[in-house]
Amino acid sequence: MYAIIMTGGKQYKVQEGDVVFLEKLAAEEGSSVTFDKVLAVSKEGNLSFGAPVLESASVSGKVLNHGKGEKIIVFKYKAKKNIRKKKGHRQPYTKVQIEKINA
């Protein structure tokens, strides 16, 4: 059984017991979260889609921790003008363990 959820503007295919890295959520470590935007659920070989979401389905999980991804360097320059800009960015994420798919 798997489900496709939407959170943080992205879609994730999850199964029970999976550990996924999501865009940062406003939840404390150790707390439980529920994802109501379930786009599709596959149960016993039957795949059901929503239009755009399934109203009766939800996915629950537990927040393991928060963190930041690897550093990405953004470097901009203008040729022959001696203009250089170097900037770094680390995207925050939330690590979630999927506990149950309710369908």
Swiss-Prot record:
Pfam families: Ribosomal_L21p. Coiled coil: none annotated. Keywords: Ribonucleoprotein, Ribosomal protein, RNA-binding, rRNA-binding. One of its GO terms (biological process) is translation. One of its GO terms (cellular component) is cytoplasm. The keyword Zinc-finger does not apply. It comes from the Bacteria. GO terms for molecular function: rRNA binding; structural constituent of ribosome. Part of the 50S ribosomal subunit. Contacts protein L20. This protein binds to 23S rRNA in the presence of protein L20. Belongs to the bacterial ribosomal protein bL21 family. This is Large ribosomal subunit protein bL21. It comes from Ruminiclostridium cellulolyticum (strain ATCC 35319 / DSM 5812 / JCM 6584 / H10).
